[in-house]
Amino acid sequence: MSQVCDICGKGPQTGNNVSHAHNKTKRRFMPNLQKVRTQLPSGEVKSIKACTRCIRSGAVVKPVAKKAVS
């Protein structure tokens, strides 16, 4: 499963775990991705993976909720 934001392209970064003895082992810092339904400019509603920064900045347009038929 790809860990890349569909809007900004943010992906995993590499770094080190550092123990108290200063031993270093490689690790990956993953972006905080959320699966969210968004409305594309064409009007189509699609589910994408977006990082929380894109969601908070307003780059993700939430679709208008459908009204229940009664």
UniProtKB/Swiss-Prot annotation:
Pfam families (UniProt xref): Ribosomal_L28 (PF00830)
Species whose genome carries this gene: Maridesulfovibrio salexigens (strain ATCC 14822 / DSM 2638 / NCIMB 8403 / VKM B-1763)
SUPFAM superfamilies assigned: L28p-like
GO annotation (BP), single: translation
Gene3D superfamilies: Ribosomal protein L28/L24
NCBIfam families listed in its UniProt record: L28
Protein name: Large ribosomal subunit protein bL28
Keywords: Ribonucleoprotein, Ribosomal protein
Family, per entry: Belongs to the bacterial ribosomal protein bL28 family.
HAMAP family: Ribosomal_bL28
GO cellular component: ribonucleoprotein complex; ribosome
Transmembrane segments: none
GO MF terms held by the record: structural constituent of ribosome
InterPro entries: Bacterial_rp_bL28, Ribosomal_bL28, Ribosomal_bL28/bL31-like_sf, Ribosomal_bL28_bact-type, Ribosomal_bL28_sf
